[in-house]
A protein has these predicted regions:
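Helix-to-loop junction immediately C-terminal to a conserved catalytic motif
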Residues: 53
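Helical segment within the ABC ATPase nucleotide-binding domain
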Residues: 165-178
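ABC-family P-loop ATPase nucleotide-binding domains
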Residues: 83-139, 146
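The feature captures the beta-strand-to-loop junction immediately N-terminal to the Walker
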Residues: 35-40
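Catalytic Walker B motif of ABC-type/P-loop ATPase nucleotide-binding domains
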Residues: 151-155, 160
Length: 191
């Protein structure tokens, strides 16, 4: 493994019964790269992301993140944004920030607060009182406020307006360190 290679997928295949969701994927992602997974719904983007995060086991092939199979170590260096809301929507935004700061040692509370201010999201709001787009922005803020080596974003812009989409993409590009990599999936070709 080259020291610059952060993600290596070799012959990655995932079947669900007789249906093949992913067939023999070979992918290398170097440090500091921004890669987009583009494809229609059902093309294997989320399956690939779940395999990278160790949430699924491959039918065949292998995944290495920083030289390790998905597990405890890789979870500590990956900041993952799933395609569905996973947060407790009864919590206030500032409580979610505190929760992430307590849970992740690499969480940057100042960065999260600055991004909330930029998007004019009230930290005292309960998540469920925010629009769908603002809920997605909060999830992205929490994900991008970690000092991770790899940011894995599954359809982060699917439900937001075009102006917010631009902010999210620029945030994804500008708020990670120079050596961090970003893997973003989308089915929207304009992105």
């Amino acid at each position: 493994m080259d020291n610059n290679e952060l993600v290596i997928c070799q012959g990655l295949t995932k079947n669900y019964g007789k249906k093949t969701a992913l067939n023999n994927l070979n992918l290398t992602l170097g440090r500091g790269q921004f890669i987009g997974l583009l494809g229609p719904n059902g093309s294997g983007k989320t399956t690939t992301i779940k395999l990278l995060n160790g949430l699924l086991q491959p039918t065949s092939g292998s995944v290495l993140i920083d030289g390790q199979a998905p597990g405890t170590y890789t979870h500590s260096i990956i900041s993952y944004l799933p395609d569905k809301n996973y947060l407790n929507d009864a919590m206030k935004v500032n409580d979610l920030i505190s929760f992430f700061a307590d849970f992740y040692t690499d969480f940057d509370r100042v960065k999260a607060t600055d991004m909330l201010d930029s998007l004019q999201i009230d930290p005292l709001s309960r998540l469920k009182t925010l629009s769908k787009g603002n809920q997605e922005k909060v999830q992205l803020i929490l994900t991008m406020s970690r000092k991770a080596q790899l940011y894995v974003l599954d359809e982060p812009i699917a439900g937001v307006d075009p102006a917010a989409r631009d902010y999210i993409l620029s945030t994804s590009l500008s708020n990670s360190s120079e050596d961090a990599s970003v893997l973003l999936s989308t089915h929207l070709i304009a992105d």
